Amino acid sequence: MLTTSEVSSDQQQVYHRLGFRLSFRASLWLSLSCCVAAPVLQNSLMPNRAEAWELLCEYTKGDSLRKHALAVEAVMRACANRYAEGPADVDEWGIVGLLHDFDYEMFPSADQHPFTGANILCGRGYSDRIIRAIMGHATYTGVPRDTDMARALFATDELCGFLVACALVRPTRSLDDLEVSSVKKKLKDKAFARSVNRDDIKQGVEELKVDLDEHIRFVIDALRPVQKEIGLNPITV
């Protein structure tokens, strides 16, 4: 059970929005003093991909973060067809990948990201489903990954960055000749791409209930069509 002293104003607004349990005192305080972002109407049209890209570019100016967003978007679109239990909205899954870190450049601290971004998304008309998945990809938020979309985002985010790092140190700078065995070897080398959280990769695979080798191959294949856009070099036609 969380209290108001344990969460910031941005965090309080998002938890309130998503129905995350707070103490009675905290809930009462929120109802009286928090200006929660405008609710999304059930029948409202969610922003499309072009609008999502515009939002990303509004808050993210750096090339590397934009490329990472494009990478995760591509993989999430592939995940929609592979992991969704029912008919998946591929664009919705892609938007989750595109926007999962859109606030990070401006609001990088753990008490801001992804809380500030989630509040912005609330006000822009994005669904709670998208917002919950984005909140869930940061384990410290405490928001459970209780949908296929949320689990897929968590399982692909860190791995996307790691695979791009693996490709960039190859002579070809390509994913086309990157083998799963090479990726696993580099995962064991803690000095390589040290900012990548190996524990998150492991946990993500476990939550998706897939084999690590299979997941690495799947993500490589999902990234190959967008190699040029994310700064890599396709060597096969």
Region locations from a protein language model:
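C-terminal binding/interaction regions
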Residues: 194-200, 210
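Charged phosphate-binding loop/patch that engages nucleotide di/tri-phosphates or the phosphate backbone
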Residues: 203-237
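Cationic, low-complexity basic patches in intrinsically disordered or flexible, solvent-exposed regions
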Residues: 12-13
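Cysteine-centered motifs
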Residues: 34-35
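Divalent metal-dependent catalytic cores for phosphoryl transfer on phosphate-bearing substrates
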Residues: 88-190, 202
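Acidic/His-rich, divalent-metal-binding segments that scaffold phosphate/diphosphate chemistry
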Residues: 43-110
